[in-house]
Protein backbone atom coordinates (compact mmCIF):
# COMPACT_ATOMS: atom_id res chain seq x y z
CA UNK A 1 0.00 0.00 0.00
CA UNK A 2 1.40 3.40 -0.99
CA UNK A 3 2.49 5.68 1.84
CA UNK A 4 0.55 8.87 2.40
CA UNK A 5 2.31 12.14 1.63
CA UNK A 6 2.64 14.81 4.33
CA UNK A 7 -0.15 16.75 2.63
CA UNK A 8 -2.43 13.71 2.54
CA UNK A 9 -1.74 13.04 6.22
CA UNK A 10 -2.55 16.66 7.09
CA UNK A 11 -5.82 16.45 5.16
CA UNK A 12 -6.75 13.18 6.85
CA UNK A 13 -6.06 14.72 10.27
CA UNK A 14 -8.06 17.88 9.56
CA UNK A 15 -11.18 16.28 8.08
CA UNK A 16 -13.78 14.44 10.14
CA UNK A 17 -15.36 11.57 8.24
CA UNK A 18 -19.10 11.96 7.60
CA UNK A 19 -19.24 15.33 9.36
CA UNK A 20 -21.66 17.96 8.09
CA UNK A 21 -19.96 21.34 8.48
CA UNK A 22 -21.21 24.87 8.89
CA UNK A 23 -19.97 27.08 6.06
CA UNK A 24 -17.54 28.82 8.42
CA UNK A 25 -16.12 25.50 9.64
CA UNK A 26 -15.61 24.27 6.08
CA UNK A 27 -13.79 27.45 5.06
CA UNK A 28 -11.60 27.28 8.17
CA UNK A 29 -10.59 23.68 7.45
CA UNK A 30 -9.82 24.30 3.77
CA UNK A 31 -7.82 27.44 4.59
CA UNK A 32 -5.80 25.56 7.22
CA UNK A 33 -4.54 22.80 4.91
CA UNK A 34 -0.94 22.85 3.63
CA UNK A 35 -0.65 25.24 0.70
CA UNK A 36 -0.30 23.94 -2.83
CA UNK A 37 2.32 25.39 -5.18
CA UNK A 38 -0.31 27.58 -6.84
CA UNK A 39 -3.27 29.66 -5.70
CA UNK A 40 -6.13 27.20 -5.23
CA UNK A 41 -9.75 27.97 -5.95
CA UNK A 42 -12.52 27.34 -3.46
CA UNK A 43 -15.21 25.50 -5.36
CA UNK A 44 -18.83 24.72 -4.64
CA UNK A 45 -20.93 21.80 -5.84
CA UNK A 46 -24.69 21.91 -5.37
CA UNK A 47 -26.81 18.79 -5.89
CA UNK A 48 -30.16 19.87 -7.29
CA UNK A 49 -33.48 18.06 -7.31
CA UNK A 50 -33.77 18.11 -11.09
CA UNK A 51 -33.67 15.59 -13.92
CA UNK A 52 -31.21 17.09 -16.45
CA UNK A 53 -32.38 14.58 -19.06
CA UNK A 54 -35.51 16.72 -19.35
CA UNK A 55 -34.89 19.90 -21.32
CA UNK A 56 -37.15 21.94 -19.05
CA UNK A 57 -35.05 20.99 -16.00
CA UNK A 58 -31.64 22.10 -17.25
CA UNK A 59 -30.46 24.75 -14.80
CA UNK A 60 -28.00 27.20 -16.31
CA UNK A 61 -26.98 30.69 -15.32
CA UNK A 62 -24.40 33.19 -14.11
CA UNK A 63 -24.12 34.83 -10.71
CA UNK A 64 -22.16 37.99 -10.02
CA UNK A 65 -20.36 37.27 -6.75
CA UNK A 66 -20.32 40.20 -4.29
CA UNK A 67 -16.86 39.28 -2.96
CA UNK A 68 -15.48 38.33 -6.39
CA UNK A 69 -13.49 35.22 -7.26
CA UNK A 70 -9.99 36.53 -6.63
CA UNK A 71 -9.04 35.86 -10.24
CA UNK A 72 -8.08 38.26 -13.01
CA UNK A 73 -10.55 37.71 -15.84
CA UNK A 74 -9.68 38.55 -19.43
CA UNK A 75 -12.73 39.52 -21.51
CA UNK A 76 -13.19 39.58 -25.29
CA UNK A 77 -16.15 41.47 -26.76
CA UNK A 78 -17.75 41.26 -30.20
CA UNK A 79 -19.26 44.67 -30.85
CA UNK A 80 -18.97 47.65 -33.15
CA UNK A 81 -19.61 51.38 -33.03
CA UNK A 82 -20.82 52.86 -29.76
CA UNK A 83 -21.11 49.44 -28.14
CA UNK A 84 -17.47 48.70 -28.92
CA UNK A 85 -16.40 52.00 -27.35
CA UNK A 86 -18.53 51.29 -24.28
CA UNK A 87 -16.94 47.85 -23.92
CA UNK A 88 -13.45 49.36 -24.06
CA UNK A 89 -14.35 51.96 -21.44
CA UNK A 90 -15.74 49.20 -19.21
CA UNK A 91 -12.36 47.45 -19.28
CA UNK A 92 -12.66 44.79 -22.00
CA UNK A 93 -9.27 43.35 -22.92
CA UNK A 94 -10.08 42.66 -26.57
CA UNK A 95 -12.81 44.31 -28.66
CA UNK A 96 -13.52 43.61 -32.30
CA UNK A 97 -15.89 42.20 -34.88
CA UNK A 98 -14.82 40.41 -38.06
CA UNK A 99 -11.18 41.07 -37.13
CA UNK A 100 -11.67 39.40 -33.74
CA UNK A 101 -13.29 36.39 -35.41
CA UNK A 102 -10.29 36.06 -37.75
CA UNK A 103 -7.93 36.30 -34.79
CA UNK A 104 -9.78 33.51 -32.97
CA UNK A 105 -9.79 31.34 -36.09
CA UNK A 106 -6.02 31.89 -36.17
CA UNK A 107 -5.69 30.37 -32.72
CA UNK A 108 -5.67 33.45 -30.49
CA UNK A 109 -7.75 32.54 -27.45
CA UNK A 110 -6.10 34.55 -24.69
CA UNK A 111 -9.29 35.33 -22.77
CA UNK A 112 -11.60 33.75 -20.22
CA UNK A 113 -15.00 35.17 -21.20
CA UNK A 114 -16.54 36.11 -24.56
CA UNK A 115 -19.36 38.66 -24.72
CA UNK A 116 -21.30 39.57 -27.85
CA UNK A 117 -23.77 42.25 -28.86
CA UNK A 118 -26.86 40.63 -30.45
CA UNK A 119 -25.96 41.85 -33.95
CA UNK A 120 -22.55 40.18 -33.63
CA UNK A 121 -23.97 36.67 -33.32
CA UNK A 122 -23.98 36.25 -37.10
CA UNK A 123 -20.19 36.43 -36.83
CA UNK A 124 -19.79 34.62 -33.52
CA UNK A 125 -22.06 31.77 -34.64
CA UNK A 126 -19.41 30.68 -37.14
CA UNK A 127 -16.97 30.15 -34.26
CA UNK A 128 -19.09 27.55 -32.46
CA UNK A 129 -16.68 24.67 -33.07
CA UNK A 130 -13.85 26.70 -31.54
CA UNK A 131 -15.59 28.50 -28.67
CA UNK A 132 -18.19 25.86 -27.78
CA UNK A 133 -15.87 23.07 -26.57
CA UNK A 134 -13.98 25.60 -24.44
CA UNK A 135 -17.12 26.87 -22.74
CA UNK A 136 -16.62 30.31 -24.30
CA UNK A 137 -19.63 30.53 -26.61
CA UNK A 138 -21.75 33.59 -25.72
CA UNK A 139 -25.24 32.75 -24.51
CA UNK A 140 -28.12 35.03 -23.51
CA UNK A 141 -29.01 32.70 -20.61
CA UNK A 142 -25.78 33.63 -18.83
CA UNK A 143 -25.82 37.27 -19.89
CA UNK A 144 -23.02 37.08 -22.45
CA UNK A 145 -25.24 37.95 -25.43
CA UNK A 146 -26.62 41.36 -24.57
CA UNK A 147 -27.00 44.90 -25.92
CA UNK A 148 -25.48 46.10 -22.62
CA UNK A 149 -21.98 44.87 -23.37
CA UNK A 150 -20.45 47.38 -20.94
CA UNK A 151 -22.51 46.01 -18.06
CA UNK A 152 -21.60 42.45 -19.01
CA UNK A 153 -17.90 43.36 -19.06
CA UNK A 154 -18.13 44.91 -15.60
CA UNK A 155 -19.93 41.85 -14.24
CA UNK A 156 -17.34 39.49 -15.72
CA UNK A 157 -14.45 41.57 -14.40
CA UNK A 158 -15.93 41.84 -10.91
CA UNK A 159 -16.19 38.05 -10.65
CA UNK A 160 -18.94 35.76 -11.87
CA UNK A 161 -19.78 32.13 -11.31
CA UNK A 162 -21.10 30.49 -14.49
CA UNK A 163 -22.71 27.10 -14.23
CA UNK A 164 -24.77 24.47 -15.98
CA UNK A 165 -26.20 21.40 -14.32
CA UNK A 166 -24.32 18.22 -15.26
CA UNK A 167 -25.72 14.76 -16.02
CA UNK A 168 -25.82 13.93 -12.32
CA UNK A 169 -27.92 16.99 -11.48
CA UNK A 170 -25.01 18.93 -9.94
CA UNK A 171 -23.75 22.43 -10.64
CA UNK A 172 -20.10 23.31 -10.06
CA UNK A 173 -18.61 26.79 -9.68
CA UNK A 174 -15.56 28.60 -8.35
CA UNK A 175 -16.70 30.64 -5.37
CA UNK A 176 -13.41 32.28 -4.31
CA UNK A 177 -9.85 31.31 -3.47
CA UNK A 178 -8.04 29.67 -0.58
CA UNK A 179 -7.34 32.52 1.81
CA UNK A 180 -10.74 34.20 1.43
CA UNK A 181 -12.31 34.73 4.83
CA UNK A 182 -15.52 32.99 5.79
CA UNK A 183 -17.62 36.17 5.56
CA UNK A 184 -16.64 36.67 1.90
CA UNK A 185 -17.36 33.04 1.04
CA UNK A 186 -20.72 33.22 2.82
CA UNK A 187 -21.65 36.30 0.76
CA UNK A 188 -20.76 34.50 -2.45
CA UNK A 189 -22.41 31.19 -1.55
CA UNK A 190 -25.67 32.75 -0.37
CA UNK A 191 -25.87 34.91 -3.50
CA UNK A 192 -25.31 31.85 -5.70
CA UNK A 193 -27.88 29.73 -3.83
CA UNK A 194 -30.43 32.55 -4.06
CA UNK A 195 -29.94 32.67 -7.83
CA UNK A 196 -30.25 28.89 -8.10
CA UNK A 197 -33.57 29.05 -6.27
CA UNK A 198 -34.81 31.67 -8.73
CA UNK A 199 -33.87 29.27 -11.54
CA UNK A 200 -35.79 26.33 -10.06
CA UNK A 201 -37.73 24.65 -12.90
CA UNK A 202 -41.49 24.65 -12.44
CA UNK A 203 -41.50 20.90 -13.06
CA UNK A 204 -38.92 20.16 -10.34
CA UNK A 205 -40.59 18.32 -7.46
CA UNK A 206 -39.46 17.59 -3.92
CA UNK A 207 -36.29 18.95 -2.30
CA UNK A 208 -34.50 21.31 -4.68
CA UNK A 209 -31.22 22.16 -2.88
CA UNK A 210 -30.27 18.63 -1.83
CA UNK A 211 -26.59 18.89 -0.91
CA UNK A 212 -23.81 21.49 -0.83
CA UNK A 213 -20.12 20.59 -0.95
CA UNK A 214 -17.20 22.99 -0.56
CA UNK A 215 -13.71 22.03 -1.71
CA UNK A 216 -10.36 23.48 -2.68
CA UNK A 217 -8.58 22.59 -5.93
CA UNK A 218 -6.24 20.09 -4.27
CA UNK A 219 -8.23 19.52 -1.09
CA UNK A 220 -11.13 17.37 0.08
CA UNK A 221 -14.82 17.99 -0.46
CA UNK A 222 -16.61 18.98 2.75
CA UNK A 223 -20.37 18.59 3.10
CA UNK A 224 -21.99 21.85 4.22
CA UNK A 225 -25.26 21.97 6.14
CA UNK A 226 -27.83 23.21 3.62
CA UNK A 227 -29.82 24.78 6.46
CA UNK A 228 -26.75 26.83 7.43
CA UNK A 229 -26.87 28.58 4.06
CA UNK A 230 -29.71 31.08 4.02
CA UNK A 231 -30.69 33.07 0.94
Swiss-Prot record:
Disulfide pattern: none
Any one Gene Ontology molecular-function term assigned to this protein's record: rRNA binding
One of the record's GO cellular component terms: cytosolic large ribosomal subunit
Entry-linked InterPro entries: Ribosom_uL1_bac-type, Ribosomal_uL1, Ribosomal_uL1-like, Ribosomal_uL1/biogenesis, Ribosomal_uL1_3-a/b-sand, Ribosomal_uL1_CS
Keywords on record: Repressor, Ribonucleoprotein, Ribosomal protein, RNA-binding, rRNA-binding, Translation regulation, tRNA-binding
Pfam families: Ribosomal_L1 (PF00687)
Swiss-Prot/TrEMBL GO biological process terms: regulation of translation; translation
Protein function: Binds directly to 23S rRNA. The L1 stalk is quite mobile in the ribosome, and is involved in E site tRNA release.
Subunit: Part of the 50S ribosomal subunit.
UniProt xrefs under PANTHER family: 54S RIBOSOMAL PROTEIN L1, MITOCHONDRIAL (PTHR36427), LARGE RIBOSOMAL SUBUNIT PROTEIN UL1M (PTHR36427:SF3)
UniProt record similarity statement: Belongs to the universal ribosomal protein uL1 family.
HAMAP family, per the entry: Ribosomal_uL1_B
Protein name: Large ribosomal subunit protein uL1
UniProt source species: Acinetobacter baumannii (strain SDF)
